[in-house]
Swiss-Prot record:
Highest taxon, organism lineage: Bacteria
UniProt cross-references to InterPro entries, sorted A to Z: Membr_insert_YidC, Membr_insert_YidC_N, YidC/ALB3/OXA1/COX18, YidC/Oxa/ALB_C, YidC_ALB_C, YidC_periplasmic_sf
Designated name of the protein: Membrane protein insertase YidC
Pfam families (UniProt xref): 60KD_IMP, YidC_periplas
GO molecular function: membrane insertase activity
Any one GO cellular component localisation term in the record: plasma membrane
Purpose: Required for the insertion and/or proper folding and/or complex formation of integral membrane proteins into the membrane. Involved in integration of membrane proteins that insert both dependently and independently of the Sec translocase complex, as well as at least some lipoproteins. Aids folding of multispanning membrane proteins.
Cellular localization per UniProt: Cell inner membrane
Organism of this sequence: Burkholderia pseudomallei (strain K96243)
Entry similarity comment: Belongs to the OXA1/ALB3/YidC family. Type 1 subfamily.
Gene name for this UniProt entry: yidC
Subunit details: Interacts with the Sec translocase complex via SecD. Specifically interacts with transmembrane segments of nascent integral membrane proteins during membrane integration.
Membrane-topology annotation of the record: Multi-pass membrane protein
Any one of the GO BP annotations: protein insertion into membrane
NCBIfam families: PRK01318.1-3 (NF002352), PRK01318.1-4 (NF002353), yidC_nterm (TIGR03593), yidC_oxa1_cterm (TIGR03592)
């Protein structure tokens, strides 16, 4: 029995270590097993974003503007003074900086349920402590870019109750014979923003510009509870390579691996629960770039060439900008593969069906907490035959534990004879000491997947359960669920045979305390899942053990 228990604890410990190490590497931190080489802060702005040299004049003309923070360069100040234009819709409050017509602040608005504060979250921001921007401009000459001050076109800045769309337009100064009119279109109930760039050639010669669309962000986490970390950083999606995550650490070391040109897909910045993504028109060729532009500032973007524009003519480049929560069903309807920004890691193949099932149950019961309870119950029912096999093996081992202890005491000075005697006992009683391991091991990927489902699902944010639980994404405010978790673990240890080794027995008694401390900081939805799982496991074990005990008693009586 102690061998099987040791194997299970080793499996559990290694799973926990590997999950933690995977989280470390996903956030650009050093791996415990693979030391990082010395990081560099070089990110040449003379490159074209995919590692090619910008030595030629054409490449220099297409080099991205080098203002690292999104503010104006520290050189000659422009004649016009930039200002922030505030706007509001039913889902956004935000600010557009007239310097570049940049989307400099974007707050996703959502009201609370009266028992907690509003659930609004600021996605884009530009402060001394945090930078996250969406910006565009022109390349290919001395054309308007995100450093130039635009003029706001007169018009409403709030979505009226009787309107479905709000348009905000900004005009650039004339540079290189080109004027740009940038228009943001906000739609009621939508987290997709239309961004139209109208390029007017007001000069005397044809121009061939390129439009760049980029997301600029620092590497700081925002609104990330303890032990609730998921991927943070840029991502690229194309039909060729599908979803490619890029860690800030890989960018630091110039090891970022991604598709550098395509005519489909999107680029994104991903964080816990929320994401932003530029989605150019499908079929339009574009170059993709990911760069470090400051010690803590990064950008991911696309450069889309525009056909030659004759004097007096204009060209329009349309794109969509998603900025919102990582709700799978909504993301699936916006762009192919966009739902992948909701990151389940290496268990995606199992996690996605589990979330689908959780979502269906929620649609039936209308409460995410009860949906977690019912899904856990359903999973335990599916795995009942495997659990029964494990508990039966444990029960049989419990029956022969006194005889095992006697053999250990008898042959304690001769380990070889002791092992031979134990093997003979197992053979005589037809007991496999590892018989309970395999059923448990098979279930581990499912339980890890459900962990990631609950961790990554923005639906848990602000979702109440009962009584004191008003937000399943936050820790239990009164620590009731962690205490119940500790109690359930303690009961489980009592149901199992006491290990013959006193040190191991003390460890088994200590584990509930150690794990309960860790669970004090877990989101309530995760702890609820573990509590329900433990309670159901206790009920299963008690039922199976009692059934076997009754059968054994009848056999002896006969």
């Amino acid at each position: 029995m102690d061998i099987k228990r040791t194997v299970l604890w080793v499996i559990f410990f290694m799973s926990a270590v590997m999950l933690f190490d995977n989280w470390q590497r996903s956030h650009g931190r050093p791996s415990m097993f693979f030391p990082n080489v010395t990081q560099t802060n070089t990110a040449s702005n003379a490159t074209n974003g995919n590692g090619a040299s910008g030595a030629s004049a054409a490449a220099a003309a297409n080099a991205l503007p080098a203002a690292a923070t999104g503010a104006a360069p520290a050189t000659t100040a422009p004649a016009a003074q930039a200002q922030l234009v505030r706007f509001s819709t039913d889902v956004y409050n935000g600010e557009i900086d007239t310097r570049g017509g940049t989307l400099a602040k974007l707050t996703l608005t959502k009201a609370g349920d009266g028992k907690q504060p509003d659930l609004s979250v600021t996605l884009f921001d530009h402060t001394a402590n945090h930078t996250y921007l969406a910006r565009t401009g022109l390349l290919g000459g001395d054309f308007p870019n995100h450093n130039d001050v635009y003029a706001q076109v007169a018009g409403p800045t709030s979505l009226a109750a009787d309107q479905n769309t709000l348009k905000l337009s900004f005009e650039s100064p004339v540079k290189g014979g080109v004027k740009v009119v940038k228009t943001y279109t906000f739609t009621r109930g939508s987290y997709v923003i239309g961004v139209d760039t109208k390029i007017e050639n007001v000069g005397a010669a044809p121009v061939t510009p390129s439009v760049y669309m980029e997301l600029v962000r620092d590497n700081s986490s925002v609104e990330t509870p303890m032990f609730s970390h998921t991927f943070l950083g840029p991502a690229v999606y194309t039909d060729q390579k599908h979803f490619q995550k890029i860690t800030f650490g890989d960018i630091d070391k110039n090891k970022a691996d991604y598709v550098t040109s395509a005519d489909n897909g999107w680029i994104a910045m991903v964080q816990h629960y929320f994401a932003s993504a530029w989605i150019p028109q499908s079929g339009a060729k574009r170059d993709i770039y990911v760069e470090k532009i400051d010690p803590t500032l990064y950008r991911v973007g696309v450069k889309q060439p525009v056909a030659a524009i004759a004097p007096g003519q204009s060209a329009d480049v349309s794109a969509r900008l998603f900025a919102g929560p990582e709700e799978e069903r909504m993301l699936e309807g916006i762009a192919p593969g966009l739902e992948l920004v909701k990151d389940y890691g290496w268990v995606t193949i199992i996690a996605k069906p589990l979330f689908w099932l959780l979502e269906k149950i929620h649609g039936f019961v209308g409460n995410w907490g009860w949906a977690i309870v019912l899904l856990t119950l359903l999973i335990k029912a599916v795995f009942f035959p495997l659990s029964a096999a494990s508990y039966k093996s444990m029960a049989r081992m419990k029956e022969i534990t006194p005889r095992m202890q006697a053999l250990r005491e008898r042959f304690k000075s001769d380990p070889q004879k002791m092992n031979a005697a134990l093997m003979e006992l197992y053979k005589t009683e037809k007991v496999n000491p590892f018989g309970g391991c395999l059923p448990v091991v098979i279930q581990i990927p499912v339980f890890i997947s459900l962990y990631w489902v609950l961790l990554a699902s923005v639906e848990m944010r602000g979702a109440p359960w009962v009584l004191w639980i008003h937000d399943l994404s936050q820790r239990d405010p009164y620590f009731i669920l962690p205490v119940l978790m500790a109690v359930s673990m303690f009961v489980q240890t009592k149901l199992n045979p006491t290990p013959p080794d006193p040190v191991q027995a003390k460890m088994m008694m200590f584990m509930p305390i150690a794990f309960s401390v860790m669970f004090f900081f877990f989101p309530a939805g995760l702890v609820l899942y573990y509590v329900v799982n433990n309670v159901l496991s206790i009920a299963q074990q008690y039922y199976i053990t009692r059934t076997l005990g009754g059968a054994a008693a009848k056999k002896k009586a006969s």
